[in-house]
Every structure is written in C-alpha cells, then in structure tokens.
Amino acid sequence: MSAKEVKFGVDARDRMLRGVDILANAVKVTLGPKGRNVVLDKSFGAPRITKDGVTVAKEIELEDKFENMGAQMVREVASKSADLAGDGTTTATVLAAAIVREGAKSVAAGMNPMDLKRGIDLAVEAVVADLVKNSKKVTSNEEIAQVGTISANGDAEIGKFLSDAMKKVGNEGVITVEEAKSLETELDVVEGMQFDRGYISPYFVTNADKMRVEFDDAYILINEKKLSNLNELLPLLEAVVQTGKPLVIVAEDVEGEALATLVVNRLRGGLKVAAVKAPGFGDRRKAMLQDIAILTGGQAISEDLGIKMENVTLAMLGKAKKVMIDKENTTIVNGAGKKADIEARVAQIKAQIEETTSDYDREKLQERLAKLAGGVAVIRVGGATEIEVKERKDRVDDAMHATRAAVEEGILPGGGVALLRASEQLKRIKTQNDDQKTGVEIVRKALSWPARQIAINAGEDGSVIVGKILEKDQYSYGFDSQSGEYGDMVKKGIIDPTKVVRAAIQNAASVAALLITTEAMIAELPKKGNAGGGMPPGGGGMGGMDF
C-alpha cells in the first residue's frame, strides 16, 4: 500500500475551500440570462462551448489532491441536482460554495461544527416548507413555455417547442432531443405507441410510394413465440378473413412455411396481413408485449399462460384504429384498450421506476411509460456548426427537464427571488444555542447569492439589487437582469420550477454541511519521478544509465 498524506484542521479546510472556490467560480459565470459561456477543451475534436453548470463542473479535475476533493464534493451537488430535477445545477453550486465559505469561517472562529450542521439542517427544512407553501400549479401552456425559455437562457423558440411538445404528448409523454441535419430546429410528434421493429418482409407493403404498411381498424395478434407452422394459425386466419379487417402479427419471428403462406395470401389479395418482430429482448420483450396487449385491448398469447395458438379466438386479439409499419418502426394509434387497464399499467410502471437503481432500466421503463401514456415527441436541434448545435442541445435538455419539473411540483418566481423571500423566514427560527443560530445565519446569507450572482453576471451591483428586492414586501417582486428593470417576476414570465429550487438548496446544504464538519483529509502522496522512464539524449530509452 502506498504512503498517504494527511492534512488536519484549518490546513485541510483551506485546501478544500480553494478547490470549492475554483469549481464554483468556473460554474457561476453561466448563471442568469446574461451568464457567459465556458469553453471546454476536448482530447479529440473541436472544443465544446456550454452554458450548462453541470457540464462545466464535470470537466474540472485539479492537480492538488486535497483541493480536488473539495471540488469533487461540490461537483456531486451539481450532479445530484441534475439527476433529481435536471436543472438548477449552477444555483446549487453557488449555494454550496457560499455555505462552505461562511461555515469554514465560523469553524475557524471556534464554533462547534456539529451544531453548525444542525442549524443548517433546521434552516433548510424551513426554506423547503416556505418554497412548497408559495408554489403555484402550472395551469397554462404559456407558463410551460416561460419555464422552458428561462431555462434555455432566454431562448423563446426553445420554450415554445417544449410547450408544443408537452401539449401534444401529455405530461408523461417522452420528449427526446436529437441533433438535426439542417439549420432549423423542428418538432416531430409520433402519436400512439411506436416501437423499433419494422415489417419482416417487404411484400407486406400496402403503400408502395412510401414503402410502408398502412392499415385501418386492424386486428393485432400478439404472440411470444416464433411462428413457423401455418396449421396452428389457419383457424384464426379464416375468422379474420370473414371479418374483412386487416391483421398485424407481432411475434418473436415469423419464418418458413408460415411466412411464405402469409406473403402469398397477401399478394393474391385475399388477406390483408403484415408480420412484425416483437420489440425488446428477454423479460423486457414479455413486458413490452404485455404493454401492447393492454393498449390494444388484446391478450398476449403465451404458453406460460397455457394458451395454445390453435385455440386463439378473435376476442383475444387486440384492435387499433390505425397501424403503420415501415422498414424500421411500427406505430399503433388509438388502441382499443380500456382506460382503467392502461392507467393501472401506467401506475405499475411508475412504481417500478421509483424502485429501480439502474439508470438504464429507468430509461427503458420511462420509454415504456411514455408509449402507454401518450406518445413521443422528438425535438431536432439545428444550427450552423456542430459546436453551435451541441451548445443549443445542452440548453434544450435543461429546458426540457425544467418544464417537466414545473408540471410535477409547480412554479415559483425566478431570478433567485424565491430563495431571497425564504431567507426572511429564517429570522423566526428557534434554535437551542448560538452555534446553531450561526448555522441558520450561514444559510440565510447563502440564499441571497443566486440573485446576487445573476445581477453580477449582468454587470450590476449584486448587493444593491438584493437590498432593493428585500425592501418590497410583494412576494414575486424582483429584478429582471435581461431588461434591467424591477417588477413582478411571474408577470414578466421569469419563473423557476419549485422542484429545481428545492433540489438546489437541499443538495447544496447536504454536501456543504459535510465539508464544514471535516477535520482531516487523506490522499495518496504524489509519485516521485524515477529515472527509469526517461529518454535523455543518447540514452536509447535507458534513462539514468551512464554510457
């Protein structure tokens, strides 16, 4: 085991604080509508330009191990806020740095770190309660657009795209963000359920111009196994032919005799049919087939349930108003499933999302949820250069998470105003001793920093602006740094999602309190350079040897 270096007390906290400040200073320049960009060097390709706090934080690694520990702890604040609310990472970083800075001063002055921590925890509880109390539900599409615009750094076009997307696919629907091939940003909405499997054979195509299958009022057979023998299918096919409606077969695979017969019947015109491979793999495939069955009001045919193919009746088939299948995707619109069944399935998937610990599983479950709940919207972000597209895509991602958070927990006045107002409530908190009172005071001071930093980034005097905002009693009164005017933030459309503000203060205080209570730090000693690896002139790679 290699030797370690240990730092104690003031020395440890000073090093840590330096790291916190370096990271916070790099991140805080991006805050607010007049925040600046940060350029990140990439080991390959062009540098990346971003205004996203968490992206900047993730790039920072410091040479000094002890400074780096401080920076990494605060980076965790930004990451946690991004995971929980998807936005507010810069606010969280600014808050954490402010709490650590004031806390370190108090500890150096001889106060008890554990009492300071208890005071900080008390203050955060009171702040969260105040935020929740003053939170307003999002009622209109216009408010969703405003949240998106603020989070996308004042880009109204992005705000509008997001509110349109949420209007079309619902609050639970999936909105994905991709890079466009053109200059324009566009919105593409897929209604109903879409999965990434196309037709098994091109002979099923009904619309030759678009090379796709289009069926109206179709039956859907959902089968878990491969279909290779036609005999077991015949009774069902005859029943479907008599109804005159088309049939879509979703199965693990359709091959051999079964596929050949379906194609021949399709070409002769007697049977409108198309076959598609089932989406997903393994257990996920079973779950997705069950989703399709619930959406279309059918039954997933599975030998586990003791249902054999030859016993399948028309009543077991799903139905949909429209089915479209191209080479790569199948879309089912207006399935005939019962609303109550679909809602129960949605609730079940939501419960699984809450329980899962894997990010990959969570993403897949959210996709399934969206397909059941409404549809999928794709925002394709355009721009003149790849660097511009990437920077804009970062902002669209932030804005998308912010609008989701706003729908979930409501909205508050933006521009750091909600935290400023909450700081006034902290004057009334009863504490057990003076050190705890100082802990509350540390949070109270820190809460003014987001509003102050937004003003500083806009070239204003932060202290003057915070003072003027607090002079007025009106809750949503604040400073619009874009226009340089004071007024009602909500009426001006400057609003933040409650969830984002709440996550920012909770995560910032959690990590900052841990940093304040740190008394020792341990890191590996830097490796001493040995001569063996060098290449001095004429050494031929044998560094340190005399010739």
Curated annotation (Swiss-Prot):
Q: Which GO terms describe its molecular function?
A: ATP binding; ATP-dependent protein folding chaperone; isomerase activity; unfolded protein binding
- At which positions is ATP bound? T30, L31, G32, P33, K51, D87, G88, T89, T90, T91, G415, D496
Q: Which UniProt keywords apply?
A: ATP-binding, Chaperone, Cytoplasm, Isomerase, Nucleotide-binding
The alphabetized list of GO BP terms reads:
protein refolding
Query: Where in or outside the cell?
Result: Cytoplasm
Coiled coil regions in record: none
Question: Which HAMAP family does its entry note?
Answer: CH60 (MF_00600)
Q: What does this protein do?
A: Together with its co-chaperonin GroES, plays an essential role in assisting protein folding. The GroEL-GroES system forms a nano-cage that allows encapsulation of the non-native substrate proteins and provides a physical environment optimized to promote and accelerate protein folding.
Q: What is this protein called?
A: Chaperonin GroEL 1
**Gene behind this chain?**
groEL1
